Each structure stands twice: as C-alpha cells, then as structure tokens.
Amino acid sequence: MNSISNQTIPHQASRYQAAFSRLKAEGRGAFVPFVTLGDPSPELSLKIIDTLVQNGADALELGFPFSDPLADGPVIQGANLRALAAGTTPTACFELLAKIRAKYPELPIGLLLYANLVFANGIDAFYAKAQQAGVDSVLIADVPVEEAAPFIQAAKAHGIAPIFIAPPNADSDTLAKVSQSGEGYTYLLSRAGVTGADTKAGTPVEEILAKLQEFNAPPPLLGFGIAEPAQVSAAIKAGAAGAISGSAVVKIIETHQQDEVKLLAALGEFTRTMKAAT
C-alpha cells in the first residue's frame, strides 16, 4: 500500500478543470444532474446516463444505492430502494462506472455517497476501485471536512478529488477548511436539511460564494432544491460555477419508470431546458 501512496498519481481534478475552463471560455456555467446508479435497473440506468450526457450534462454526480440515506428526501430514498430491488450492488456500480468512463473519456464523473459504503471493504480499497473505474471525485455526504483526514489521504493516494460541502450556515473556519481540502469543485448547499424537489433554493448564497472565492476554493456548484431553469440562472448569476440537480431528475425517473420511451424523452427535455439556462 505504501508504494502506491508514495507515487504521485495525476489528479483526476484535471477533468473538472478542463470542463470549467471550456465553460468559462463559452461564458456559461455547468449543469450537473445527479442519479442513483442502478435506478430503476442497471440496464436502464446506463440509458438514462447516456440521455443526460447527450442532452447537455457537463458532468455527472452519481450515487451508490444505500438503504438508509440520512440526508435524502423521499424522492432519492425511492431511487435507492428501486436500485437495490433491481439487485444493484457496489460491484455492479463500479462496472457501470467503468462503462460510462469508457464511453465518455473527458466527462467529469463524481460520486456522492455515504461513509458506510466506503468503510465496507476498507477506505483505501474503495478509492482504488473508484480510480480503476475512472471516477474523478468522491463526496461523502455524512463526513464533514473536520473528520475527513483518512478519506482525503486515500483519495489523494488514488488521484481522486475529495469534494466537500459548504453548508449555508458555515463559519469562516469551516469554509477555509473546505476550500483548502477540496479539489475539483465545491458542493455549495443552497439550504440546510434534506434534499428535495419542492423547496426553493432561496438562501442568499452570495456571501458564501464571496468567502469561497476569498479562500480560493475549487469552483462552487450549487445543489439542493434545484428543479427549474430559473434557479440555474440565478445560481450562476450569483457567482456559482453551475448547479447540481438531483431530486428533480430522480422524480422524472420515478414518474416514468414503467415507460422507457417516455422516461428518456422527459429526461432529455429536462436536461436541455436546464442546460439552456446556464
């Protein structure tokens, strides 16, 4: 293990850097959808991801199904349960990730998951598998930056960008730590609480964005409650590098899970509309 951590493996944050540079040159922001791998089934999950990318997603944020998601609202919990019912294991998730990476060599791919999944087979082993599958970044939702040292170490040993959440109620100390420890991008919460499609992303974020800039944080993407194009434009106007939409995307999967044609058409339409707002 030591030999690995002593080598300098190039950071996967470079795919994010390339994407953000390209968007900056175009004068646009990023639209990043979130879905749970394997929802509603591993096969359809791949088609869903193809649809998101082909209709303008600038990066992907992907979850591993987990049966006790503390920070997730009912929509994402539903996605977890559907994926688990379809037999989506962590091994199946890594296989899906490798396929996605092979198809889209330049696309930034991030994981958003819970510490239990990372602990299951050892922290280092998880990051090694993530690196092998072509993952660029890992955000562990229930590990604050203050407790993240072992995860950061494993991430860096395997050339993966550790991502941190900047909560809306964070003090300067926390924002400084998030800025120093994070790579790739910063996940900026538009409000505290659980994820959901209904609540407006109404927290004034300009102040946090100014602080993150002052601390030279990786580009901030605004997440939580992003369900409409107007919220994407507002996030970018406020100074975010883009927006992440999870529950709104998963809601479409939930609604049309029995009808593949309608499902992919609705996801394509949603992605195009959200991307157009960047």
Swiss-Prot record:
UniProt record similarity statement: Belongs to the TrpA family.
Name of this protein: Tryptophan synthase alpha chain
Top enzyme class: lyase
InterPro entries: Aldolase_TIM, RibuloseP-bd_barrel, Trp_synthase_alpha_AS, Trp_synthase_suA
One of the GO biological process terms: L-tryptophan biosynthetic process
Domain of life: Bacteria
GO MF annotations in UniProt: tryptophan synthase activity
Gene3D superfamilies with a match to the protein in the record: Aldolase class I (3.20.20.70)
Keyword Amino-acid biosynthesis set for record: yes
Active-site feature positions: 61 (proton acceptor), 72 (proton acceptor)
Source organism of the structure: Shewanella oneidensis (strain ATCC 700550 / JCM 31522 / CIP 106686 / LMG 19005 / NCIMB 14063 / MR-1)
Function: The alpha subunit is responsible for the aldol cleavage of indoleglycerol phosphate to indole and glyceraldehyde 3-phosphate.
Subunit structure: Tetramer of two alpha and two beta chains.
SUPFAM superfamilies: Ribulose-phoshate binding barrel
The EC number(s) this enzyme carries: 4.2.1.20
Highest classification ranks of the organism: Bacteria, Pseudomonadati, Pseudomonadota, Gammaproteobacteria, Alteromonadales
UniProt entry keywords in alphabetical sequence: Amino-acid biosynthesis, Aromatic amino acid biosynthesis, Lyase, Tryptophan biosynthesis
